[in-house]
């Protein structure tokens, strides 16, 4: 249950607070010179490296804009690569529980906390990251906001569609999935792989390179935008790039209590610089990076595209799973049918 401590969790969080406090004293992960302290400072934590496109091209410029518009009264200090401690699946709860001020992460890392968001990962929800991001915000207040208790969503955007990247066995037809161990980023996308006959393996993106290289997994389900950021073209040989698979949503969320305690003028700076507009910048970066990944893979890797008939076979294989997910949500008291209908997933 969101926000409820499990046995032994208090000690873990206490230790983590100690680790983070030490990290804050020693880490110089900020876009501002040491000594240029503002009246308010927000610490944003993530698993991505500082070279990641969203970190470098969206969040860093945003933090600079916040400092400029607030005239130095508010700064956002960026901590990449899990510098404040913990593991990637813990990022959202770190922020939700006030251990950090904000985070950039995936809802899919803790799918049980985001039952409505999980439905947006199903196949057929969008035609591009831009399209998917607009749909996320169009459905946010009515369907998705309930997943974000204790936080304020600053950014929410879609990735490009997932691809299948494999080292030794290409995926050209539905039958090729049988028995393949494929990395998945979330429970929602695990269900897609099971529907196709594969064996899903939960794994954060930071473990894909070594796992694929050593044969721990046969393939990874991941967008082409990640191929360059995480150097996956070095280890994968086959890329099925136009499969009708789902898309991972990403988010930047802030602790709600921390936001509410900001002065009104600084809340306005946050409000004016985030939301759909900033989210669409993230989507644009993913769409552009996806094409860059495809172009890079073309040089000495095999790109696989599916016929319209084969794509339809996959979509038919997904329908029972989509219907089951919708019914499970309804039984749990969630407006799952309304969201599935809003996306037109069952026709």
Predicted segments with their positions:
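A gly/proline- and charged-residue-enriched helix-loop-helix capping module
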Residues: 132-141
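N-terminal secretory/targeting leader peptides
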Residues: 13-14, 18-130, 143-347
């Amino acid at each position: 249950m969101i926000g409820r401590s499990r046995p032994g969790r208090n000690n873990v969080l206490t230790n983590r607070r100690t680790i983070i406090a030490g990290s804050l004293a020693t880490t110089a992960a900020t876009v501002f010179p040491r000594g240029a302290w503002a009246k308010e400072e927000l610490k944003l934590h993530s698993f991505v490296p500082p070279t990641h496109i969203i970190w470098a091209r969206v969040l860093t410029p945003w933090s600079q804009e916040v400092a400029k518009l607030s005239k130095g009264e508010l700064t956002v200090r960026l901590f990449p690569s899990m510098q404040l401690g913990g593991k990637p699946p813990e990022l959202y709860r770190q922020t939700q529980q006030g251990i950090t001020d904000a985070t950039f992460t995936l809802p899919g890392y803790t799918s049980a906390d985001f039952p409505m968001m999980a439905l947006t990962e199903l196949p057929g929800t969008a035609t591009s990251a831009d399209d998917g991001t607009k749909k996320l915000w169009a459905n946010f207040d009515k369907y998705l906001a309930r997943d974000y208790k204790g936080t304020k969503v600053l950014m929410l955007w879609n990735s490009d569609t997932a691809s299948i990247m494999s080292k030794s066995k290409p995926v050209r037809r539905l039958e090729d999935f049988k028995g393949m161990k494929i990395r998945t980023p979330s429970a929602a996308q695990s269900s897609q792989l099971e529907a196709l006959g594969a064996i899903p393996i939960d794994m954060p993106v930071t473990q894909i390179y070594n796992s694929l290289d050593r044969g721990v997994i046969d393939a990874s389900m991941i967008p082409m935008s990640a191929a360059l950021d995480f150097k996956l073209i070095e280890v994968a040989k086959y890329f099925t790039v136009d499969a009708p698979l789902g898309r991972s949503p990403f988010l930047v969320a802030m602790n709600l209590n921390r936001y509410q305690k900001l002065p009104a003028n600084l809340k306005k700076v946050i409000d004016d610089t985030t939301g759909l507009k900033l989210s669409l910048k993230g989507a644009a970066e993913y769409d552009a990076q996806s094409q860059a990944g495809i172009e890079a893979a073309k040089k000495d890797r095999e790109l696989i595209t599916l016929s319209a008939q084969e794509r339809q076979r996959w979509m038919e294989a997904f329908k029972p799973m989509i219907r089951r997910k919708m019914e499970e949500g309804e039984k749990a008291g969630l407006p799952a049918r309304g969201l599935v209908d809003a996306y037109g997933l069952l026709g």
